[in-house]
Amino acid sequence: MRLHDVKPQKGSKKRKKRVARGISAGQGASAGLGMRGQKSRSGSGTRPGFEGGQQPLYRRLPKLKGFPIVNQKIYTTINVEKLASLPANTEVTLASLKAAGILTAVKGPLKILGNGELSTPLKVQAAAFTGTARSKIEAAGGSCEVL
């Protein structure tokens, strides 16, 4: 194959339809716009979101209330039940959880949540604990250290 053999792909060089050029041209008279109505007039078209005079969706829905949280803390969260698979007396940190494959994506500092049961004692180091998570870890014989 040489450069002069290269041809455009079939269907890629489609000609534009020439409308309103006489009846015999195929798209004459109304130029494919139908008989009458707003959409057949010149400069036609309504603005985006216009619903024909009906109250549009963006006006029917209430406005959002409140303010955005400015310096929001985004934590990497994990439940106590995920820590149950670790061996006893393990030091649990963000790095160790990632190495063990329990965490995949790290969004920020580690926060331990209290969903599930824990029976093995663990030494957990995290940026934050919920009250139930702290009580479950300490009830299992482990310790909680806030970084």
From Swiss-Prot:
<comment type="subunit">
    <text>Part of the 50S ribosomal subunit.</text>
</comment>
<dbReference type="InterPro" id="IPR021131">
    <property type="entry name" value="Ribosomal_uL15/eL18"/>
</dbReference>
<protein>
    <recommendedName>
        <fullName>Large ribosomal subunit protein uL15</fullName>
    </recommendedName>
</protein>
<feature type="compositionally biased region" description="Basic residues">
    <location>
        <begin position="10"/>
        <end position="20"/>
    </location>
</feature>
<dbReference type="Pfam" id="PF00828">
    <property type="entry name" value="Ribosomal_L27A"/>
</dbReference>
<keyword id="KW-0694">RNA-binding</keyword>
<dbReference type="GO" id="GO:0022625">
    <property type="term" value="C:cytosolic large ribosomal subunit"/>
</dbReference>
<dbReference type="GO" id="GO:0006412">
    <property type="term" value="P:translation"/>
</dbReference>
<keyword id="KW-0687">Ribonucleoprotein</keyword>
<dbReference type="GO" id="GO:0019843">
    <property type="term" value="F:rRNA binding"/>
</dbReference>
<dbReference type="InterPro" id="IPR030878">
    <property type="entry name" value="Ribosomal_uL15"/>
</dbReference>
<dbReference type="InterPro" id="IPR005749">
    <property type="entry name" value="Ribosomal_uL15_bac-type"/>
</dbReference>
<comment type="function">
    <text>Binds to the 23S rRNA.</text>
</comment>
<dbReference type="InterPro" id="IPR001196">
    <property type="entry name" value="Ribosomal_uL15_CS"/>
</dbReference>
<dbReference type="InterPro" id="IPR036227">
    <property type="entry name" value="Ribosomal_uL15/eL18_sf"/>
</dbReference>
<comment type="similarity">
    <text>Belongs to the universal ribosomal protein uL15 family.</text>
</comment>
<feature type="region of interest" description="Disordered">
    <location>
        <begin position="1"/>
        <end position="57"/>
    </location>
</feature>
<keyword id="KW-0699">rRNA-binding</keyword>
<keyword id="KW-0689">Ribosomal protein</keyword>
<dbReference type="GO" id="GO:0003735">
    <property type="term" value="F:structural constituent of ribosome"/>
</dbReference>
